[in-house]
């Protein structure tokens, strides 16, 4: 029997709420993982490989995320839920536009409500600004935990930014994931 999250994913699979539906997407990338996860990651949007496979974070950024989850949290992706701010790939991997983020927000809100994670880790500016409802950037916001719903939100860098930036962003992302581990244990 399909779960409530499965039903929302099925409904989202035919979404036409914004122009991304007709911008060359292969499919909606709804999210993946444990529907009862205590930890949820929220990124920006699917890239080319994610669009092809229909799964979030399967390219180089996803490989880094998987590696850091295992090293810093001791868990694998099947024990978390991974979603994005927008569910369709923006053309040319451009940033999602405000109207696209707004059109997709109800899908993310339903995911958050149904999964009820104890800890949400936002990956990068778009997810962080949306869920914290702020204009501040990730560089100012990361390094702390924020009350969020019935748990906490921990902002960190997007893995793609870490791949580009190397040393210091990687060390900071590791520290943020340690913070997530501590919040899960609390």
What do the PLM-derived regions correspond to, one by one?
Residues 1-186:
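A polyanion-binding, active-site-adjacent surface
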């Amino acid at each position: 029997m399909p779960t409530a999250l499965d039903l929302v994913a099925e409904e989202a699979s035919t979404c036409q709420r914004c122009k991304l539906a007709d911008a060359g997407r292969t499919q909606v990338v709804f999210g993946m993982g444990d529907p009862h996860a205590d930890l949820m990651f929220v990124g920006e949007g699917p890239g080319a490989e994610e669009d092809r496979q229909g799964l979030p974070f399967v390219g180089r950024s996803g490989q880094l995320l998987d590696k850091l989850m295992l090293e810093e949290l001791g868990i694998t992706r099947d024990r978390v839920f991974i979603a994005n701010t927008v569910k369709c790939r923006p053309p040319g991997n451009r940033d999602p536009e405000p109207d696209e983020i707004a059109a997709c927000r109800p899908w993310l809100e339903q995911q958050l409500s149904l999964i009820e994670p104890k800890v949400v880790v936002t990956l990068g500016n778009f997810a962080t600004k949306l869920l914290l409802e702020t204009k501040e950037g990730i560089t100012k916001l990361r390094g702390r935990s924020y009350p969020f719903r019935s748990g906490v939100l921990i902002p960190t860098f997007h893995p793609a930014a870490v791949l580009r930036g190397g040393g210091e962003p990687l060390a900071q992302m590791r520290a943020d994931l340690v913070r997530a581990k501590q919040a899960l244990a609390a």
